Amino acid sequence: MENKRVTDSLSTVQWFIFLLANAVALPIVIGGIFQLSFEQISTLMQRTFFVVGISSFIQGWLGHKYPIADGPAGSWVSIFVILGNLALIQGQDQMYALQILEGGLIVAGLVLFVLGTTGLVYRLQFLFTPLVSGSFLFILALQLSGVLVKGMLGLQGTSAEPDVMAALISFFIFGLVIFLSIKGRGWISSYAVLIGIGLGSALFAAFGKVEPTFTDSTPVLKFPHIFAWGVPQFDLGIVITSLLFTFLLVSNTISSISAVKQVVPVLPKDEKTALSRGIWTGGISHILAALFSTIGVVPLPASAGFMKLTGQKRIGPFLMACMLLTVIALMPSVVNVLALLPAPVASAALLATFVQIVGIAFQSLLQEQLDHRRLTILGITLLVSIGLMFLPPAVFQSLPSTLRYICSNGLLVGTILAMLLEQIWKAEKKISHYQKL
C-alpha cells in the first residue's frame, strides 16, 4: 500500500511538471507580442494555468477520458500574432484586439460543442486526410518559427534592435533542449524542455537580465478575473475566421487521440464515442478560455510521447495533477515566480519542440504515396501559405475585416486550400491486372 502511494505521488508530480512545462511558455510569448506589463503577464499565466488544469481534468473525467494534457494551442497563437501585429500597425488599442479574440474563442467553442453533441463531427472526418494533417502541422511550424526566432532575438513589440546576449543564451538553450531530448536518458529526456527553461532563466538572472518586481501586497489566494481583457467583441471577420478555424481544432483533437491510441489500447467501438466527447468538451474548454481571457487550449499530441517515455498511462495520477495545477493557479506568489521566465528563453524552448512537429508532419505526409496529384496539391498549398507569410501586415490593412483575418493567416488559407484540392481533385482509382483482363 505504501509503495502504491509513493508510485502514485511520483506519477502525479511527473504529470504536473508536464502540464506546467507546456503551459508556462506561451503566455510569456503572447505577453511580449502585446507588450503586456509584468503584472498583466503574471495574471495571464495564472488564468492559463487555471484553464489548463480545469480543461485537462474535464477531458479526462467527462471528455475523451484519456490522460491527454490540454495546453495553449500553437495554432491559436498564430491568430493572436496576426491581430496583435495589425493592431500595432494601425495604431489601435491592443486590448480591443484581445477582446475580439475573446469573441473568436466563444464562437469556436460553440461550434465545437454543437459538432460534438450532435455527432456531426463524424461526417467531417473525411476532410482530414494525412495530406491535410501533414500540411497543417508543417505550415504551423513554419509560421510560428518566425515569431519564436524574433522572441529569441529580443525583438518584441516595437523593438528593432536585437539583444545580443539574450540571443546567445536563447540559441544555446535551443540547442541544449534538442541535445537532451535526443541524447538524454530516462527522466533527462522527458524533462529536456523544463531543464532548458530552468537553466536559461538562471543564465538570464546571472547576467542581470531578470528584474523581480514583486510587491508586498500579493494576496495568498486569488481567484482569476473574468473577462480580464474586457467584454468580448464580435465582428464578421472574427466570426468567419473562427468558423473556419474550427476545422483545425477538430484536426488537432483527432491527431491527439490517434497518437494516444498507439500507447493506450482502445476498443474500436469506443473510438467514435471518445472523439465526440473530446470535441464537445473542447468546446467547453474554449468558452472557459474566453471567460478567463487566455489562449485557447487543446489536447496536446505530445502527451503520447510523454506516456510512451515515462509509462504513465493511468488516469488517476493525471487527474490529481490537473487538480494540483488548478490549485497552484490560485496562489499569485507562486505564479509571480513563474512569470519571471524570460520571453527569449520561453521562445527557445518552444522552438525546440517544433522540431519534432516538423518530423511528425513529414510522417503524416508519407503515410500515403506522394504521387503526382498529392505532390502538386502539397506544392500549391505550401507556396500559397508561405507566400502569404512573407507579405507585410500593412498589405492587408485596406481589406474588409473578414478578408483581412483570413488572407493574412497563411496557416488557415493553406489548410483550407489543401482540404478543397483534396476533395475537388479526386485520386484515380487503381485498376488491377485482372480487372484489365
Predicted segments with their positions:
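N-terminal signal-anchor module of multipass membrane proteins
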Residues: M1-P67, S78-G91
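Interfacial segments of multi-pass membrane proteins
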Residues: V81-L86, S181, S303-F318, L324-I328
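Membrane-embedded alpha-helical modules
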Residues: Q94-V210, C322, V327-Q435
